[in-house]
Amino acid sequence: MRNTDRKMWFFLGSGDIILINFAFVLAYFLKFDTIELKENYIFLLLVFNFSWILVSAMFSLYTFSRVDHLEHIVSNTIKAGVTHALIITALLFSIKASEQFSRQLILYTYIIDFIVVILWRFVALAFIKRYRVSGYNYRRVV
């Protein structure tokens, strides 16, 4: 992995994780009128984060070339989001924990998450494109 790929992974990956956590806490607030998470919901949030990391690695969300079209990047992000939702649903039903968690909270989380992650991708890719056009990504060779 090149140094620039690691920076890109950190930049986009940390943004995704922060937004997933934001979406979860906002959905929790909308459902329960508090941001103080119960212990079982903290566990669910950790599962959300770890499964997103695995899904993003499966779909190579953080490695793209300069010629990738925005539609391709967004479609991969949507596919990863759907796969993430399927993994979370399967996991909750397999451990018989689906009764412990609010389905409305999970639905709110995914609605908010899809919106903010797609917007984040647009903003981040526009920033990266502007950064590259400005010439800051060139290495100085002596």
Regions inferred by a protein language model and the residue ranges of each:
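Conserved hydrophobic helix-helix packing surfaces used for dimerization/oligomerization
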Residues: 141-142
